């Protein structure tokens, strides 16, 4: 079971960053999501907090905290302006409908 302190820490990270992505270095869906953000949509890396959970001592706890917060067990686990987007499939669906660009507009305007 994940501690309330870890849950609060993860919630703070989500709130403090315009875009938050929990990822794993070996995950092809994570690579696709990050490629969409950085390469296709040209989101500056300074606007995105990417946590590579498999490279972090507390990675499993962070992933467990995200599950407690939003019910998603898998990575990538993406937030934009504090709103839970979901995973790569959700990100790509939002891109296809044009909603992703709308969500990113205030971030890219700064």
UniProtKB/Swiss-Prot annotation:
Enzyme nomenclature, EC number: 1.11.1.9, 2.5.1.18
Keywords: Cytoplasm, Disulfide bond, Electron transport, Glutathionylation, Isopeptide bond, Nucleus, Oxidoreductase, Redox-active center, Transferase, Transport, Ubl conjugation
Reactions listed under catalytic activity: 2 glutathione + H2O2 = glutathione disulfide + 2 H2O; 1-chloro-2,4-dinitrobenzene + glutathione = 2,4-dinitrophenyl-S-glutathione + chloride + H(+); RX + glutathione = an S-substituted glutathione + a halide anion + H(+)
Modified residues (S-glutathionyl cysteine): 27
Result for mutant: residue 30 to S: Leads to increased oxidoreductase activity
GO cellular component, one term: cytoplasm
GO molecular function (one): glutathione transferase activity
Family: Belongs to the glutaredoxin family.
UniProt-recorded name of the protein: Glutaredoxin-1
Species in which this protein is naturally found: Saccharomyces cerevisiae (strain ATCC 204508 / S288c)
């Amino acid at each position: 079971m994940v501690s309330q302190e870890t849950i609060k820490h993860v919630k703070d990270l989500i709130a403090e960053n315009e875009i938050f992505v929990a990822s794993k270095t070996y995950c092809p869906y994570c690579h696709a999501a990050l490629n969409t953000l950085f390469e296709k949509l040209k989101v500056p890396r300074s606007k995105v907090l990417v946590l590579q959970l498999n490279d972090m001592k507390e990675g499993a706890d962070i992933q467990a905290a995200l599950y407690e917060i939003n019910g998603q067990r898998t990575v990538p686990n993406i937030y934009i302006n504090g709103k839970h987007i979901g995973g790569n499939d959700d990100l790509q669906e939002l891109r296809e409908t044009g909603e992703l660009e709308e969500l990113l507009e205030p971030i890219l305007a700064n």
